[in-house]
C-alpha cells in the first residue's frame, strides 16, 4: 500500500491543527496511521505554534537535487537530503527530519518514526507565497509529457512489463493519502497525482525490462529526472496547500 511521504502528511495536518486550534497531538495521529510509535516532534511543533508559526512546509530533497524550498547547505538540509524529506517552518527556520525504523522481535515488529529537530536559516515567506498552483500544475504536466516523449523517442515504454504494473497496482490498492479536509482542490489533485507518479517510478526503477545496457542507462536517467520533477511538484503543492489552509483560517468569518 502506498502512503505519501510522512513530511507531506505531517506538514498539512499540523497546519490544519494550528488553523483549527486543535491539539497537535491529534495531527500526529491523523497524519501517521501507518506508524506504531512516534518519538519527538510534538514539543517542537507546539513550540513553533506558541511562537507564532502558522504554516508548516515541506521539502523533498535528494542527493545532488535540492528541492529549492530549504536554504541550500547546512546540517539541516544535509540531514533532509539523507532521508529525502523534511518539514519546516519558514519564519523561525526550524526543521524536523523524519527517520523510520522497525523495532521489536521478529514476527512482531512495529514501525517507529523519530522526528529529528534541526535549526536552519529562515525562509522568506514571500518566496513560498509565490508558489502558484497553476504554475506548479503546468510545469508538472509539461514534465510528464516531455519525459514520456523522450522514452518513446528511444523506443522504450515508460513502464515495462506486467509484473512492474502489477506491483504498482498492489502499492496503490487502497492508497492511504491521510490528508486533512479543506485543501484546495487543485492542490489535492497535484499532490495525489504526483504521489501516484512517484509510486510508479519507484517500481519502474527496480527493473530494466530486458533492455540493452545503453537503453537501460538512458531509461534510468529519464525516469530519475521525472522522479525529481514529481517530487518537486509534490513538495511545492503541499507547501502551497499549507499556506492556503493558514490563509483561509485568518480570513474574517
Where are these regions (language model features)?
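Arginine residue identity/basic-tract feature
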Residues: 9, 22, 44, 49, ...
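N-terminal intrinsically disordered, low-complexity regulatory tails that precede a folded domain
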Residues: 1-91
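Alpha-helical oligomerization segments
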Residues: 151-253
Amino acid at each position: 500500500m502506498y502512503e505519501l511521504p510522512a513530511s507531506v502528511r505531517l506538514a498539512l495536518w499540523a497546519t490544519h491543527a494550528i488553523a483549527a486550534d486543535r491539539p497537535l497531538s491529534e495531527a500526529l495521529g491523523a497524519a501517521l496511521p501507518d506508524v506504531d510509535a512516534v518519538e519527538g516532534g510534538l514539543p517542537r511543533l507546539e513550540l513553533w505554534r506558541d511562537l507564532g508559526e502558522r504554516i508548516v512546509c515541506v521539502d523533498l530533497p535528494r542527493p545532488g537535487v535540492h528541492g529549492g524550498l530549504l536554504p541550500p547547505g547546512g546540517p539541516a538540509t544535509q540531514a533532509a537530503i539523507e532521508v529525502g524529506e523534511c518539514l519546516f517552518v519558514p519564519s523561525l527556520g526550524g526543521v524536523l527530519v523524519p527517520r523510520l525504523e522497525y523495532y521489536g522481535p521478529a514476527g512482531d515488529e512495529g514501525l517507529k518514526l523519530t522526528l529529528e529537530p534541526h535549526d536552519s536559516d529562515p525562509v522568506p515567506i514571500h518566496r513560498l507565497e509565490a508558489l502558484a498552483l497553476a504554475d506548479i500544475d503546468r510545469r508538472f504536466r509539461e514534465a510528464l509529457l516531455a519525459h514520456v516523449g523522450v522514452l518513446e523517442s528511444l523506443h522504450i515504454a515508460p513502464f515495462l512489463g506486467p509484473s512492474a504494473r502489477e506491483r504498482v497496482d498492489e502499492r496503490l490498492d487502497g492508497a492511504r493519502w491521510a490528508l486533512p479536509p479543506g485543501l484546495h482542490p487543485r492542490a489535492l489533485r497535484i499532490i495525489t497525482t504526483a504521489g501516484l507518479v512517484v509510486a510508479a517510478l519507484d517500481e519502474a526503477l527496480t527493473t530494466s525490462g530486458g533492455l540493452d545496457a545503453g537503453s537501460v542507462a538512458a531509461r534510468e536517467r529519464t525516469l530519475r529526472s521525472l522522479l525529481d520533477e514529481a517530487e518537486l511538484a509534490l513538495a511545492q503543492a503541499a507547501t502551497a496547500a499549507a499556506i492556503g489552509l493558514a490563509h483561509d483560517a485568518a480570513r474574517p468569518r
